[in-house]
Amino acid sequence: MFMAYATSLRSADLSRQIGVVITKNNEIISEGTNDCPKSFGGLYWPEICRDGSIQDIPSGRDYTLGYDSNKRSQLEIIHAILDNLKIEDSPDNIKAIKKAGIGNLTEYGRVVHAEMEALMMCARNNISCKDGIMYATTFPCHNCAKHIIASGVKEVIYIEPYPKSKALEFYINEITQDETEKDKKVLFRPFMGVGPH
């Protein structure tokens, strides 16, 4: 779990920093953090320039853009709803629509989630994660959960809860938190032990 936490420290995501490692036979086979994807695989990381300075590629990571594309898209949807319904574009109305669930949308972000990056790292390197164990600093979102299920990972161990996740609601036949069902479903369980921070 310490390695998952250490991986999370590399993230420059504007909303939260998450780290993941996948193990198989007690060895780490991949890692992932949430950040923007780079062409031909992997994520954007700072690069060493000819003058020795370390810099991020302009427009590579979200913080270099100066905005979060997911939050921007949420606001565009909210304003479109208000315009189409001919409702006043006021802070109270925006807040009410966000509370209705639009504020929980995650699919408009440029960032690859840490769980997805760890699975993609396995795919890029022709490593099977079937029967692997995923260690995550946060409970996976429902989008990541479906890919975890499909990948063949048998267990997910996490530190922090993620109340926005609908994974347990959407995948009642595929995910369990009951250890007695771990032979039939993917086990999602909280980390027990000395925490990494």
Task: Please describe what each predicted stretch is.
Residues 1-197:
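Zinc-dependent deaminase catalytic domain
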